[in-house]
């Protein structure tokens, strides 16, 4: 378990923020961030979550000196036909890098790829159907809408 937690914390900074642009003019997006699920890809014992975002004032991401989190994932298991949120010992909270370092209010949109590693499921569970709900907060603590990954099944190692 110690090794798993160590690998999770080492993986936290591995966040790809690509395709960030400011093609839209200021005021075309609300100041609250808006996210949209794009894809969820499982590769071995880890996974990648892809989503897009817009933010009207560009205060997305945290400076290296900030100590909090701005990306939050809730983990759910399908238990006896009902979705149940499971609080894991090491939560899947992440830090997105600052996209607008100028400090000027400016609309941004982009795509984010989050590496969820090494274990994207609950190793202590007998349930095999999972999904994630995720959201972000900007520097002003505006919370985005919540998005959900599709349901997926895992196969326990034999």
Task: Give each language-model segment a name.
Residues 2-10:
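Bacterial N-terminal signal peptides that target proteins for export
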Residues 10-17:
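Hydrophobic alpha-helical targeting segments used for export or membrane insertion
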Residues 19-22:
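C-terminal motif of bacterial Sec signal peptides marking the signal peptidase cleavage site
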Residues 24-26:
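Bacterial signal peptide processing site
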